Amino acid sequence: MALNVVILAAGKGTRMRSDLPKVLHPIAHKSMVQHVIDTAHEVGSDAIQLVYGYGADKLQAKLGEQQLNWVLQAEQLGTGHAVAQANDNISDDDTVLILYGDVPLIQASTLESLLAVRDENGLAILTVNLPNPMGYGRIVREDNKVVGIVEQKDANAEQLAISEINTGIMAAPGKQLKAWLGQLSSDNAQGEYYLTDIVAMAHKDGVAITTAQPESAVEVEGANNRVQLAQLERAYQARAAEKLMLEGANLRDPARIDIRGDVSVGMDVMIDVNVVIEGTVNIGNNVTIGAGAILIDCDIADNAEIKPYSIVENAKVGVKASAGPFARLRPGAELAEDAHIGNFVEMKKALLGKGSKAGHLAYIGDATIGCGVNIGAGTITCNYDGANKFQTIIEDNVFVGSDTQLVAPITIGKGATLGAGSTITKDVAADELVITRVKQRHISGWARPVKKAK
């Protein structure tokens, strides 16, 4: 049987008080519905039906390049009505997994468990026991077998006392699901077509109904307002922080890290507070990440150190290399083994070779710098003429004095020395000393201008 996933994402989310469709609000820098789509792929979906309604243009602008079947729900008439819109894309022999675009923390392992407990032609529903089930549909059992689901507004006093609730997530056989959806009625307190009514239909038809539960109730929580969205964000971050610690990272405070992507860590990694990690980040063994650092799509090798308040984006930091504090590695920057940049040094599309250093207050762009090079404070590679960018090449063991400008394209030969305050516009040969400063003048008897009275 093919696994056909239906994701319900048509709601406006009025309580969000936003023009953005509810499912596009982010958790960890990724829309809620994208989390669900990614999880659907993780469980091996053969097809994904995205049922949409409000904010169609924004949804398609955000998700349009993905392999999705777009199914319009023109009127929001309930969950059963929403799933029914996808009937034309469901084959009789499909296993249909129904998910929700505003329930972003559902785990692939939980869905795999749900699919595993389902009989070949049976119905499997994901339930959870809550100490306070207020507002949720209750699972009705007879002799411990599920016979139906009753919504909060339609429940009697006995049913309201039930703590096992419906999460809405279920797996059903395609042929029977389409038949059940065709029998739904809106004769209820909400005047909607409840997907939950198919459970009673399945029981009546003698179809086996099985249940599974998530490892944690937070997996099945949705976000209807920004308070709930923030609560899900915290839950996501707590889970991500726990994963890092289990992989070998020491987090100075697990509640003060922001993980917005996929991060892998080696052993004995130390991460201080208020670090932000985005995209795909790989951190080696014995790495130290200082407070307030931002890591985006980067690789940090063994024994490296990113000091406080530094930014590393689309860059590489080599073994025993260090950056910061307050350093910035922009896209294409690379620190080789044991290289170092200090405070207020910025690099872009540049390589700083093994053992080389730029201690402070420098800009290095479109440059290749060899081994053992010293870049003095205030040094700038002048790589842009207003129209095009040019390369600076600095060979091994060069000493660049403070406040030096290197006007590209230019090559500085091995072992050369550039005097402080120089503006270098021509290539420098190996082992040369170059100084371009204006000759110092001494003017005796100089008097400063007197300020005019106001």
Curated annotation (Swiss-Prot):
Entry keyword ATP-binding: no
Places the protein is found: Cytoplasm
Cofactor descriptive note: Binds 1 Mg(2+) ion per subunit.
Any Pfam family matching the protein: NTP_transf_3
Residues where acetyl-CoA binds: A377, N383, Y384, S402, A420, R437
GO cellular component, one term: cytoplasm
Record's keyword annotation contains Transferase: yes
Region (Linker): 227-247
Role this protein plays: Catalyzes the last two sequential reactions in the de novo biosynthetic pathway for UDP-N-acetylglucosamine (UDP-GlcNAc). The C-terminal domain catalyzes the transfer of acetyl group from acetyl coenzyme A to glucosamine-1-phosphate (GlcN-1-P) to produce N-acetylglucosamine-1-phosphate (GlcNAc-1-P), which is converted into UDP-GlcNAc by the transfer of uridine 5-monophosphate (from uridine 5-triphosphate), a reaction catalyzed by the N-terminal domain.
Protein name: Bifunctional protein GlmU
Organism: Shewanella piezotolerans (strain WP3 / JCM 13877)
Top-level taxonomy: Bacteria, Pseudomonadati, Pseudomonadota, Gammaproteobacteria, Alteromonadales
